[in-house]
């Protein structure tokens, strides 16, 4: 019942419908209010009529796997690549075009754009407080079951780490790990999100000079990538081990990690990281 009430209320607000407008010609406004408070279970016939007005299938209210087609699909694909490359200039350019172009957006799509804006604010304009506040507000208004919640929480965690709020970062990291334990990793977005969280944590451990723990975290995440047959974040994880390994591993071992990462960058056409790896190899050979 809680799922029905929450999804019903969120979808109505997403479409900017008042309770009265939604109820008009179908039922009493008081019934809409009771549904949203979880005090009334509508009949199948009533729910069907309301679902038509809300433009969703009937299963939407009960099945958390049901997704409504996004109007930002192309933008999301492009922005994902730009975020991986840390190309915030092009990300901002595409964001501005999308904001001007988009008219009707679902709540999740609007929240996605807010999430992107917080990243642009943080990295492009050094508006760290505003970006953090924006993400904190996002987390208050969307369900923790949604993909955008996980993205926003992970980004907020990174921001906390970068501004020195270590306790907040570690609390968020623990929360993220708990949430991901409930997700189905057959869903690529959940798998990639989980890998990102673990990579970020390994990077955080490096910043704290906990190199052994960082290597262990990276190795475990690499094993996950192999189990799931994905190369996502594999090159950065190998580079991280190589960088940490200068403290503990032999020169040839470190070199092998860099070379493996370099080959992946060539295969998947990642010139920015490839350039970094070539520099690491030159520095290593000069030692």
Q: Each predicted region: which residue ranges?
A:
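A short, Lys/Arg-rich alpha-helix, primarily the initiator
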Residues: 1-14
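DNA major-groove recognition helix of helix-turn-helix/homeodomain DNA-binding modules
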Residues: 45-60
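Residue register of alpha-helical TPR repeats
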Residues: 73, 112, 151, 189, ...
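Helix-turn-helix repeat elements of alpha-solenoid scaffolds
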Residues: 83-97, 122-137, 166-179, 210-219, ...
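Amphipathic alpha-helical segments of tetratricopeptide repeats
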Residues: 95-102, 135-143, 174-185, 219-230, ...
């Amino acid at each position: 019942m809680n799922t029905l009430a929450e999804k019903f209320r969120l979808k109505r607000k997403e479409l900017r419908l008042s309770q009265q407008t939604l109820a008009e010609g179908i039922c009493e406004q008081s019934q809409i209010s009771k549904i949203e408070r979880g005090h009334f279970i509508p009949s199948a016939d009533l729910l069907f009529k309301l679902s038509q007005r809300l433009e969703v299938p009937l299963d939407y209210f009960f099945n958390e796997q049901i997704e409504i087609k996004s109007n930002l699909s192309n933008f999301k694909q492009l922005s994902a690549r730009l975020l991986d490359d840390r190309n915030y200039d092009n990300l901002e350019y595409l964001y501005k075009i999308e904001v001007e172009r988009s008219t009707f957006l679902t709540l999740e799509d609007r929240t996605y754009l807010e999430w992107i804006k917080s990243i642009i604010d943080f990295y492009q304009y050094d508006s760290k407080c505003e970006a953090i506040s924006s993400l904190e507000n996002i987390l208050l208004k969307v369900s923790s079951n949604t993909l955008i919640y996980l993205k926003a929480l992970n980004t907020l965690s990174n921001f906390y780490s970068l501004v020195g709020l270590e306790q907040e970062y570690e609390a968020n990291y623990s929360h993220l790990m708990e949430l991901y334990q409930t997700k189905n990793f057959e869903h690529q977005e959940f798998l990639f999100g989980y890998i990102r969280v673990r990579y970020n944590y390994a990077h955080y451990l490096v910043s704290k000079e906990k190199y052994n723990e960082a290597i262990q975290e990276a190795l475990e995440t690499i094993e996950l990538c192999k189990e799931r047959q994905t190369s996502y974040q594999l090159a950065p994880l190998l580079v991280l081990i190589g960088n940490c390994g200068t403290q503990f591993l032999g020169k040839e071992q470190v070199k092998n990690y860099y070379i493996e990462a370099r080959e992946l960058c060539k295969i998947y056409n990642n010139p920015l990281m490839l350039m970094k790896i070539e520099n690491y190899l030159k520095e290593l050979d000069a030692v």
